[in-house]
């Protein structure tokens, strides 16, 4: 799994396979795969549900805004799959 937050973009370029990430609001510690691992995966799946996620999905999937870590996940030789409900997909 991945928990790379905008305030920890350095985790995208880490040479380690996994790192400790800290949620920017709750401070919760999480183990995350790094960008290097994610971009070398055979298959990456982004899952999103709910209307509250619609703008974020658009920002990442359509506009590829660089301030969002998920915009940097582009598997080199793999497949990127989006699983969305109609509410989270309404702006794409």
Question: What do the PLM-derived regions correspond to, one by one?
Answer:
Residues 1-92:
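Conserved phosphate- and dinucleotide-binding cores of soluble alpha/beta proteins
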């Amino acid at each position: 799994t991945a928990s790379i937050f905008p305030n920890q973009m350095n985790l995208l370029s880490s040479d380690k396979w996994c790192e400790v990430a800290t949620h920017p609001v709750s401070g919760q510690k999480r183990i995350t795969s790094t960008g290097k691992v994610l971009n070398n995966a055979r298959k990456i799946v982004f899952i999103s549900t709910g209307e509250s996620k619609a703008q974020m999905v658009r920002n990442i999937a359509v506009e590829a805004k660089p301030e969002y870590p998920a915009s940097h996940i582009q598997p080199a030789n793999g497949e990127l799959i989006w699983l969305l409900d109609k509410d989270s997909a309404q702006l794409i």
